[in-house]
Regions:
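A nucleotide- and high-energy phosphate-metabolite-utilizing enzyme signature
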Residues: 1-145
Length: 145
């Protein structure tokens, strides 16, 4: 119902592929299953998404505890070359989908275009992923903290 399209548009679009193992698990999984997933097969794009995660509904304390317990997954002390290559691949994919045309003042997409908001956020999150495990000051959810 929440992602249903009405005459007024979507209430809220939900992409159910953006969750642990979407092909073989139910929409909601146990906390232990989530921990096992992230510990064993969690990916860098999920780390990046979890940087900004925060509980917003339900039992806020349980949500905060979950994110706190997931902290070692999000904030790795040692980031290997494969992980850095994976981040580069994410950036290449963004450019392939969105393109990376030159900046033109008239009609330039300030959100998704070259040098736009999303590119700045990606740069900041990359720095957080690479260095946040050792530098706790980089662990903020806001881009401009």
């Amino acid at each position: 119902m929440i992602d249903e399209s009405t005459a007024d548009g979507y209430v809220f679009r939900v992409d159910l592929r953006l969750r642990p193992d979407p092909v073989s698990t139910p929409v909601a999984i146990s906390v232990n299953s989530a921990f096992a997933y992230y510990e064993n097969v969690g990916q860098n794009w999920e780390r990046a998404a979890l940087i900004k995660a925060r509980p917003v509904a339900g039992d806020i304390a349980i949500g905060a505890a979950f994110l706190s317990d997931l902290s070692p997954f999000i904030w790795r002390k040692y980031f290997d070359f494969a992980a850095i290559a994976d981040i580069h691949a994410m950036k290449r994919q963004i450019h392939a989908v969105r393109g990376h045309e030159t900046i033109a003042v008239a009609g330039h997409d300030i959100k998704l275009g070259r040098g736009g908001i999303r590119e700045i956020e990606f740069f900041v999150q990359t720095q957080q992923l690479v260095f946040g495990g050792r530098r706790t000051a980089l662990r903020g959810r806001r881009t401009l903290d």
